[in-house]
Amino acid sequence: MLDHILEQYLAQLSTAGKAPATQRAVRSDLLQYCTWWEQTHQRLFDLTQVVERDLRAWKMFRQQDEGAAPATINRGLSTLRRLCTWAIEQRLLIENPTKEVPDIASTPVSPHSLPDQAVDALLRATRAEPDPRLRLRDEALLALLVYAGVRIQEACDIQLRDLDLASGTLVVRSGKGGKARRLPLHSEAQRTLGRYLRKVRCPEGLPPIGSEQERAPFLVGMQRAVAGRPLVPGIKTRVARQRIAHLGQIAATQLEEAATRERDLERAAQLRAWAHQLETASPHQLRHSLARRMLKTGAQLPEVQRMLGHSRLSTTGLYLTPSEEDVRVAVERAGL
């Protein structure tokens, strides 16, 4: 249970216009710390009674007893620092117990991405869908994730008015933190999205500019339980994730089958490795994969930052960190 100071802090986050996801994350961090504090001290949480040694003990508990990742612990510390700074500004706290508590040092972790060959196999997996309407819809969904690097929620929130094929641009209105951005579209994405628009989403033509119909969702879902399985505007994030996972399984199976036909053992092993990665493919991995492809082909960090919608360049900089596979290849090359 959160004390009155914490509830005031959470209320001002809402007033300040912080995104709902940010508010939920902050509440979760604070609730986790409060629960630990109450169980440790056997009394109700009181922010004015928190001292530096409490925070150091909590860090040790999270790291050694719970095995939490350094990034997770540091995020919690950051939340507590902002809370205490605000409480002092409001004269609800005299001293800041977080002032001398450092973050846990950690080695930067490279965001997990898929190799180009695995992404290509995923794109080809849509051919296994027997319903041409769903196949084109899945191709459009993948085009947004693979070529534009949008988040899965952003893809599901895209409206018809957000896509301008004439100029080859896409407007993402529901970016993280409520930030919107305008993105250039890869030529392959333009062709795929245009084909989906003409044959599935708007076979009778686009709605009039400025009309209410323009605000309808770009992607469609299917009512499988209804006769004829009609399409309806809009697709839930959960369903979109399931489709990507399903396509990942199909692509993995196809690569496994290719491996059994491959005579070259090294090549067969590589195919199986890609198949293994695709078994757990996720939308966010496709976003990471775009960032790595852009950097590998000479893009600058600010360009990647703009595409992905990162607030801080340091977040984008993580893509420069060698992945485990990069290090593995480097070690193999260094052999005698």
Give the label of every model feature segment:
Residues 1-336:
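Conserved catalytic core of the tyrosine transesterase superfamily
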